[in-house]
Amino acid sequence: MLKSKYLFLSLICLLTSFRLHAQFMDYGSDPAKFKWNIARLPHYNLVYPQGNDSMAYRYALFLENVYPHMSKTIGKPIKAKFPVILHPGNMQSNGMVSWAPRRMELITTPSSDLNNQSWDKHLVLHESRHVFQTGKVMHGIFKPLYYIIGEQAAGVASFFLPVWFLEGDAVSTETAMSNGGRGRLPEFNMVYRAQMLGGKKNYSFDKWLMGSYKNYTGTYYALGFDMTSYARQRYGADIWDKSTSRYIRNLLFEGSFKHYTGSSFKRLQHDTFDFLRAEWEKQDTCTQSPQYLSPAKETYTSYRYPQPINDSIVIAVKSELKDINSLVIINNGREKHLDYIGSINSRLSYRHGRVYWSELVPGLRWTHQNYSIIKYYDLDKKNIKTLTPRQRYLSPAIDEQGQHIAVSRPTVEGKNQLVLIQAEKGNELAAFDVPDNAFIKELTFAGGDTIISIAVADSGIRLLQFNFGNGIWKELLKTASANITSPVWKDGKIFFESGANGTNNIYSLNPADGQVRRMTAARFGAFDPSFGSSDGRLFFSDYQADGYRIASLPTDSMLFEKADLNRPASMPFVETLAAQEQFNLDSARLTSVDFNPKRYRKAEHTFKIHSWAPFYYDVAEAMNSGASDLSTIVKPGATLMSQNTLNTAIMQAGWYIDKGYHHGKLSFIYQGWFPVINLSVDYGDKAFNVDWTQNDKGQDITQGHYTQRNLVEAEARVYLPFNLTHNQRIRGIQPALTYYFTNNKYQEYHSRKFHNFQYILPEILFYDYRRKAQRDILPRTGYQLRLQYLKTPFNSENYGSLYAARLTTYWPGIIRNHGLMIRVGYQYQDLDNKALYLPKHLLEKPRGYHFQYQTRQQWAFKADYALPLLSPDWSIGSLIYIRRLRANLFYDLSRNQASSKSRWSN
């Protein structure tokens, strides 16, 4: 009985928690032109665009070969097949496992931040672990819940599983079951290492987990990896299997862990960090004293990708908590802002007065169709220019003459290419396939027609040399485990960054003899090497507790210490994890899979019922509502939910009782075509009639009365969400057309005919605002403009048309991260020769005012001043953590004129 109460409490908490957004995530749709295949595998149904059979087979091969080994340290999931969808058109490399509906969504474009593990293997290992996690908890007391609420039961079952455990355990798995994984990278834990050894104070477990607006606290991926891995090292490989097995019997995850270990999660974090501190103190030696060019900051500020103009002037990308990314130029420690930039996804590259980089830009319409283009900043003209059309270009490298640009291009079909671009006009000159279809994550020119690239393939990470004059590839360096990145050519040698010795440092390779040497001895990490043009001074980004600083070393201060990249330093926990799993995807002999793809017809898979409930709640309302009163969201009734595999069709149907009346409600969204279609119908309550009569003075008046008809309200909306985001500006245009119908009948004044009330509402929305920094509450600058026109085509004797314009503007506040939002609106209703006012307003009422007033003309003014008050990072017990206290001061004014002969009123 007690467990049943806990289950009900979990379900209610789910409906009002942030987890609901993850539970019913709409991951976006692919271009309508895509045609799809499906491969039905033993444990997965793999759905992918036609033309990607080779890519899909690799995913099928890895998914099925990993599956038998994934349960060793977590337990077995439920037996139902898991849908997997590949999105090759998206450049924002990522993966996701969702609960309702159950699915794995994989963006197959490799990340330019990739380590020495191929992207498909990385995704399969990490996301497969999530499949097993959520599947494991669907046993025990949660198993019957599936029959009550469907696939959303997994969300309830996972409600008390902390995100650090889910993601940390998945990172542990990707590390243990391969030669790569983020757990093998020193930079993955660099934030904690720097704060413990070089920071002013250590933070609490709650602050590390929940984050801060005052300090940088890393990610729960790294925190979770450390905690889950330490627990496995100290308490055994099966500690999380045992803890989750007990959890599905008693609903207390931390209590289950404590049952086997005697430790709380806070104690686990404390013990983990004590262990790591002891390990890192053994390595805490720094034999170099570089010169710092960027100024020291009191708050976390980073300067990345330094490009020296000369030995005292450097251009870099600056990032901080209080502002968005920007280009800055630093001259002898004095910093000057150049311009704000967008979603940069590469290093900087400087040649002849121009600074180049690649940047992610969204597609016009589709979530899973976006691009990576080449841009540059012109130091003479002081502006940013877009060089290339919308393409899939990554990691630009510029030759010494500034005439050619070499880029990496992963195609939608899964082919990896090296592409040569003309630097002045951005047109493509040639494209070359990479040996073994290795993904090129970074490049540099090595003089003349020679290009050096860092490429990742199944065999590991390699340094390749390519001559585009004769088309010959040559392997310069091959390594299986140590990650290498950021190549630079200088005086016949290749310089790059690697964490081979347990700390990220700058290394060099002499192609003539194959000798690798370590050049720096950074305390926490040296990144982004580049060289001055005169004396060969090395510039790099040096990580410290308060962020990356730009440092430089003269040639005579470099180490030139011999190194072996084939024997990288062992990172904490890695050897233990690998021994526990006893499976390595990179070295295992893989068994072929039966791969027989069939056509996947979109029309036949429009609906996919995944969840239901013995009560009614509106998912959209629950996610958008801040209400604490559950009675406004949950009602007696029943709910049925559908979301198809391709995320093109989302439907919710329900029956509920409200105010004594039975209601049926249906909502349906289709986003598989260029316009998005949104339909909703609500059937229930009682409809009314409004008719004309005369009072005792002989005047025409209206009177309303309820009828025996059941009320029907329906709405159809079609809109086009055009995304025009550019640089740091979020931009778009959204034209829309809404048709509304209700069977409430209004009698026409002259003809005395009754008509259902209905209207059409064309509108258009323009928006343009600056991206928000982490500390921003409102955009710093920008606007939104909405123009609307409402007409009742079948009630023209009673009602005139309604026009409205609303302008929202954003302004900087008095202090950084304060924000001012001003909203101005005007509404006009055409009442000439009309009998009634429309029962519809397009302008929002003043806050706190709920009276339904009559209006011919209305002006509205609203002002909001949002400001942070305090960022205390306080924990109150184990349930409340306060990152920030903020205030919103507002003022509303509305002036209304009821008729042409009326006075204006406030």
Regions found by a protein language model. Name each.
Residues A22-V156, P162:
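Juxtacatalytic substrate-recognition/specificity segment
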Residues W240, P389-R390, A522, H605-K659, ...:
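Transmembrane beta-strand segments that form the barrel wall of outer-membrane beta-barrel proteins
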Residues Y376, S508, P636-N644, H662-Y683, ...:
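Feature captures outer-membrane beta-barrel proteins of Gram-negative bacteria and organelles
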